[in-house]
C-alpha cells in the first residue's frame, strides 16, 4: 500500500537556461499541465503546482489545477516546497513529493515509489530515484546528474561530472563506458517529510550546492541521509534545453 502523500510541482518561469519553460506547448498543452496530469494519475491525495509567476498561475487555473503563488526569491525548488508546506499547514510527518515541472512524461508509478520508499526508510530524511547509465555520452553530459550510493542504498554524493571517475579506464579510452562500473543517472524526483523542509530552508545553501547547482547536496552537507532506489519505470528524460523540448514533442506528438 502506498503511503499517503501530497505532490508539489515547482514551476519557475524565469529559468536562466530556458525562460518560460513550464508554458512551452507539447501536444497542444503547456508542459506544466502534462506534468500535473501525470501526477494526478499517481496515488497522491493532493497535487499542487507552486510558482512565482502570475502567467503560470493563470495557465494552471485554466486547466483546473490547484496552484499557489510563492515568493520569487527561493534558492531552489525545495525551498519553494517548504513555503508551500507551510501554506498548506502540513503536519511535520506528512510526506511531500517534489515532481519537477519539466518532467512531462514522469511515470505515475515512480511518484508512488519514491513516497513509499521514504515511508519505509525512517533513517532517511529524503528519498529519490536513479537508473543505470548505459551510454558514455550520458556519463559526460553535465545535464545528466550522476549519483553514487553506499551498500545500504544511501547516497554518498551527486555530481554533474562523471562519478566515479574510473581513472585508468577513462585515461585509456573515453569512447566507451568503463567495464564493471555501475554508473547511475539521478532522476529528479524527491520525497521528504514536511518537517524536514523547514530544516532545509533554515540551513541555507552550502558552497557545494552552489558549485554544482544541485539542491540535494545541501541535505548531504548537513548530514541528512538520502535513500536512492532504481526506478520501477525509467522516465524518458526531462526538458532542460530547447533540444529536449523537441525530443519530447516528437515522442508525444508523433
From Swiss-Prot:
InterPro entries the record matches: Cytidylyl_trans, KdsB, Nucleotide-diphossugar_trans
GO biological process: CMP-keto-3-deoxy-D-manno-octulosonic acid biosynthetic process; lipopolysaccharide biosynthetic process
Enzyme class per UniProt: transferase
A GO CC term attached to the entry: cytosol
Compartment(s) where it occurs, according to its Swiss-Prot or TrEMBL record: Cytoplasm
Reactions the enzyme catalyzes: 3-deoxy-alpha-D-manno-oct-2-ulosonate + CTP = CMP-3-deoxy-beta-D-manno-octulosonate + diphosphate
General function of this protein: Activates KDO (a required 8-carbon sugar) for incorporation into bacterial lipopolysaccharide in Gram-negative bacteria.
HAMAP family in UniProt: KdsB (MF_00057)
Official protein name in the record: 3-deoxy-manno-octulosonate cytidylyltransferase
Source taxonomy: Bacteria, Pseudomonadati, Pseudomonadota, Gammaproteobacteria, Pseudomonadales
Amino acid at each position: 500500500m502506498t503511503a499517503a502523500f501530497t505532490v508539489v510541482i515547482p514551476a519557475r518561469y524565469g529559468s536562466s537556461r530556458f525562460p518560460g519553460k513550464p508554458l512551452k506547448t507539447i501536444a497542444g498543452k503547456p508542459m506544466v499541465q502534462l506534468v500535473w496530469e501525470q501526477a494526478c494519475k499517481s496515488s497522491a491525495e493532493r497535487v499542487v503546482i507552486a510558482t512565482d509567476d502570475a502567467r503560470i498561475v493563470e495557465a494552471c487555473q485554466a486547466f483546473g489545477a490547484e496552484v499557489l503563488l510563492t515568493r520569487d526569491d527561493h534558492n531552489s525548488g525545495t525551498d519553494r516546497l517548504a513555503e508551500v508546506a507551510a501554506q498548506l499547514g502540513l503536519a511535520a510527518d506528512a510526506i511531500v513529493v517534489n515532481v519537477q515541472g519539466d518532467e512531462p512524461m514522469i511515470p505515475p508509478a515512480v511518484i508512488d515509489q519514491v513516497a513509499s520508499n521514504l515511508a519505509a526508510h525512517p533513517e532517511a530524511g529524503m528519498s529519490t530515484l536513479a537508473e543505470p547509465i548505459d551510454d558514455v555520452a550520458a556519463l559526460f553530459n553535465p545535464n545528466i546528474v550522476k549519483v553514487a550510493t553506499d551498500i545500504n542504498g544511501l547516497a554518498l554524493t551527486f555530481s554533474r561530472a562523471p562519478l566515479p571517475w574510473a581513472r585508468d579506464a577513462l585515461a585509456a579510452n573515453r569512447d566507451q563506458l568503463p567495464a564493471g562500473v555501475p554508473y547511475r543517472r539521478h532522476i529528479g524526483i524527491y520525497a521528504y517529510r514536511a518537517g524536514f523542509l523547514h530544516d532545509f530552508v533554515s540551513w541555507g545553501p552550502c558552497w557545494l550546492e552552489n558549485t554544482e547547482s544541485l539542491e540535494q547536496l545541501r541535505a548531504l552537507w548537513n548530514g541528512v541521509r538520502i535513500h536512492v532506489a532504481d526506478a520501477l519505470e525509467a522516465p524518458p528524460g526531462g526538458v532542460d534545453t530547447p533540444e529536449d523540448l523537441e525530443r519530447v514533442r516528437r515522442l508525444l506528438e508523433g
